[in-house]
Amino acid sequence: MSSTDWEGHYQTNDTPWDKGEASPGLVDWLAAHPDAPRGTVLVPGCGLGHDVRAWAAAGFTALGLDISPSAVERAKLVGVNERTKFRLGDFLADEPHEQFDWVFEHTCFCAIQPDRRADYVRAVLRWLKPGGHYLAVNYFIPDKDGPPFGVDRDEIWARFSPHFELLEEWTPRSYPNRTGLERMFSWRRR
């Protein structure tokens, strides 16, 4: 996905992006949308799987995909149940074994090299069923020397609006060090 040594980070526990809990924006969205259509969810770049477990606790069947073998193994150790699975894989390069009703973005898009972002959009289209939902917590920072790499609303709109209908956009509750820097988007694939 990028030239970053994600496996090395997980092997040495150098994972400052892991906050030990699901995205506050996701937790709030799940609580506010108890009638959202249940189904399958893919969480690319899932790390230790906190977001995967949040989706599963809300009644979805969730798969966490990560490029780091250590992240996947540790995610499994933290906990799995009949609604959670974790799998080693490259979201950008792998062909999907199935398509999902939902794809959830949280820190994967900003972690990849900016020149791979078109690949990311194509990957979402491969993994997501037509009419499926793409829910994203985007981290808006100006830094171009990532990861995380800078992104803004204009880029998100330019990349996703040709393929998705924007249903909702808002500023979510965030981790303390990201307050005011995250924006959530709820999209439906055309």
Q: How would you name each of these model-derived features?
A:
Residues 1-43, 47-98, 112-190:
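Class I (Rossmann-like) S-adenosyl-L-methionine-dependent methyltransferase catalytic domain
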Residues 101:
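Conserved acidic residues
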Residues 104:
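A conserved beta-strand element that flanks and buttresses the S-adenosyl-L-methionine
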Residues 107-111:
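Short catalytic micro-motifs in class I SAM-dependent methyltransferases
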